[in-house]
């Protein structure tokens, strides 16, 4: 009689925990580069800075998901503006990445990504 060793198999097996976006996404070179930079930050510098983010998901988790969902250009701007909003006089609370972006968010107008969040777009 064999021992299962505490490992689950089959459909009822729990997914391993990941702090980052785990849904399937297109693995383009830009997205891979951007998410690798975010992951490098999470592994190295994030532990030195400490848990100081005022949002959920954290700013690095938000940037990772934004880049994975919307690409390096759009997701990078969304992540940048999220970090800017995280300051002492900025926003706080639950602020997820929108599943879809509004058609009026053009690539050549990155300042419009300033207030881009799922709570504002309703998606």
From Swiss-Prot:
InterPro entries: Membr_insert_effic_factor_YidD. It holds the Pfam family YidD. The keyword Cell membrane applies. It is a peripheral membrane protein. Its main location: membrane. GO terms for cellular component: plasma membrane. Keywords: Cell inner membrane, Cell membrane, Membrane. It comes from the Bacteria. It is found in: Cell inner membrane. Residues 1-23 are annotated as: Disordered. NCBIfam families: membrane protein insertion efficiency factor YidD. Belongs to the UPF0161 family. Could be involved in insertion of integral membrane proteins into the membrane. This is Putative membrane protein insertion efficiency factor. It comes from Brucella ovis (strain ATCC 25840 / 63/290 / NCTC 10512).
